[in-house]
Design a protein with these regions (language model features):
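Active-site loop-helix segments enriched in His/Asp/Glu that coordinate
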Residues: 33, 51-140, 149-162
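Active-site core of metal-dependent hydrolases
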Residues: 120-124, 137-224
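Active-site gating loops and adjacent loop-to-helix segments of metal-dependent hydrolytic enzymes
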Residues: 26-61, 134, 139, 167, ...
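Residue-level marker of motif borders
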Residues: 13-15, 71, 169
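Generic hydrophobic alpha-helical membrane-span motif
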Residues: 26, 81-82, 180
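Hydrophobic faces of well-ordered beta-strands that scaffold small-molecule active sites
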Residues: 15-21, 80-82, 110-117, 141-145, ...
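Short, flexible, glycine/charge-rich loop motifs used to bind or transfer phosphoryl groups or to couple energy/partner
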Residues: 6-7, 12, 132-133, 193-194
Length: 224
């Protein structure tokens, strides 16, 4: 079957779902960025956006997020989940804009859910307080996670699971992004989900390093 036929069928049935976006980053790349950044290591790329995050206003973020939502609507997308940075660099500007954009999304009949992005980690007390504040206020629909942003992925995930359980939220975790057999974050995430009793409420995002492992290891992780 032609995959585009399948896609068209889903759109006619009500639309498709974009379960992983970063709308606060939409329309922020420049041609110079593409020339200077494209070959940098992933961790370096996480810091490239800091300049924009410091200088952008809430209005800038709102404009970009709503433009991205409009674009998704044009592609026949029914629901979107976007990670939004919440950290001492961007402060509350991006999350405030995303909250405002929920009204825009509702007016245009497209679902919009927010996940926090822990780009500066969660072990930092300031970062943790900022994220928990917005969880307490009901601004975050899904607890987002980036274990590699912290010195201890184990401690990072323990905090993430405690927050998710406290506020009864699903978890979406960026894991194993480097296509490197030294990474075993997907396995760690699965073990933490079982340890915390949060099975069925956790999504592993990327997990491309699994493909760099031997078949027997991959099958062990698949079976967890």
């Amino acid at each position: 079957m032609d995959p585009f036929d399948t896609l068209e069928t889903k759109i006619r049935a009500g639309g498709v779902v974009n379960a992983h976006a970063h709308f606060d980053r939409a329309y922020t790349l420049t041609k110079q960025d593409m020339e200077n950044v494209v070959y940098k290591q992933l961790e370096e790329k996480w810091r490239v956006v800091d300049k924009y995050k410091r200088n952008a206003t809430t209005a800038d973020y709102y404009k970009n997020i709503t433009a991205a939502l409009s674009s998704q609507k044009g592609f026949g997308v029914k629901e979107c989940l976007s990670f939004i940075d919440i950290d001492p660099v961007v402060k509350d500007k991006a999350i405030t804009a995303a909250i405002q954009a929920k009204d825009f999304a509702a007016m245009h009949n497209i679902g919009f859910k927010i996940a926090c992005q822990t780009l500066k980690g969660i072990l930092n007390p300031t970062c943790r307080r900022m994220i928990e504040k917005h969880l307490e206020m009901g601004h975050i629909d899904v607890v987002g996670s980036l274990p590699a942003a912290d010195v201890s992925a184990v401690d990072h995930l323990d905090i993430i699971f405690r927050l998710a359980k406290k506020y009864n939220k699903r978890i979406h975790v960026h894991v194993d992004q480097l296509n490197d057999s030294r990474q075993k974050e997907t396995e760690l995430l699965a073990r933490k989900a079982m340890f915390h009793g949060w099975e069925g409420k956790v999504t592993a995002i990327h997990s491309i390093s699994l493909a760099a492992h031997p078949k027997h290891y991959r099958e062990k992780v698949y079976s967890m």
